[in-house]
Amino acid sequence: MTHPDTEGGQETDLALSASAPLGRYPSPLAAWLGLALLCILMLTAGLNQQIIFLVVEPLKESLSLSDTQIGALGGFALTLVSALAILPLGWLVDRVNRLRLLAACIAIWSASTVGFALAQSFEGLFGFAMGIAVGEAVLGPIMYSLIADMFPRDKWVRANLIMYIAGRLGGFASLAFAGTIIGFAGSGDSVLPPLIAQLDPWRIALIISTLTAPVLIILTLMIRLRSGATVKAQTGGTSQGLFIYFRANARALVGVFLGFGIVFAANGGAAAWFPAALQRGFGAKPTEIGVTMGIIGGCAAAFGVAAAALLERWLRRKVGDLTPMVMAQFATAGTILATPVMLLAPDLTAIYTLYAAKTFLLTVCLSLSPAVLQMLAPSHLRGRVIAVGGLITIIFSSMAPLTVGVLSDTAFHGPKGLMASIVVVSTGRL
């Protein structure tokens, strides 16, 4: 296996590197400010999809959609299209200016979100959802590649952990924020222009979620990277070098990709339906669900990250580099036990308690996965290696929302039929 080596502020990739060492890293202040902006982008990118998941019921009613069609939006348009886009985008991450590529993708997903909000048919929703997926597919490969161009190797784990925490907490914050936006859009007291104010609340909420895009694009182009990083990205390793790397490290990569990918897909894919299940089974409102899940999930994720850090330190002395996989195995076992119990939950309090437990366990399981991929991949292949990992996760994830929708339409009926479908899909994949 090849590993980057840092000495004197420069990085040299062993065996596979065909490029000269890069120059100095940006100042610590510039690097941490850049990381802060990347964290904000993670939150913003997830906001539109969180709103879509929260407004499934009014969206269905507005356009007379079935659960299968909603599942197709989440499974195929938003997820499978990401799988088709992530490898070409991962290749671009290693070949073009990474900051310009990220700025272009912000513009794509923002414009597509507005198009989704204004769509009048399932076909229109599907097409613009594909645009959202393409724009956001670049985030995984590019974020962790940029971290390696902003921080020296001895800071990677810390920066990765902060990015992971931001991604997890940002996801729950965006869920709570999405609920707040939906409440504002439906209040009737909005100060929006009449042309927008007359739209359905779910459409208004999606449009509001894109308002920060121009500022974020400008700030993205101002991120400082180490000197020469852009040049190296434009002259990255060949496809032959990528195949050689995968063949030499196949056993380790298969374990990492499949292990973390299946765990994420089993829970993340089916979880897209969770807000709708609470609306049908317990009569909860989208605003209440978004805020409550955001707060509970954020707290559970924070405790999960803290527990993961403590466990990692203790386990590493015993099992060494196998630590992330051992942690994932135990956390997955706990998730398997917690998921079916949701069918027995008598009220929202019990559901939210189980949701907190699952979120805690998933955070423990997945919190170290970015650092594992980053350390496995040499610099000039990093974007594509991370993209392959993302591709495998997305392939596993893509069928979950559609499968839940089909089961809800055909096999499980009644107020808790959707929750039963979620449990079957989540537990079956684990």
Name every feature range the model reports, one short phrase each.
Residues 17-28, 225-256, 281:
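Juxtamembrane intracellular "pre-TM" segments in multi-pass secondary transporters
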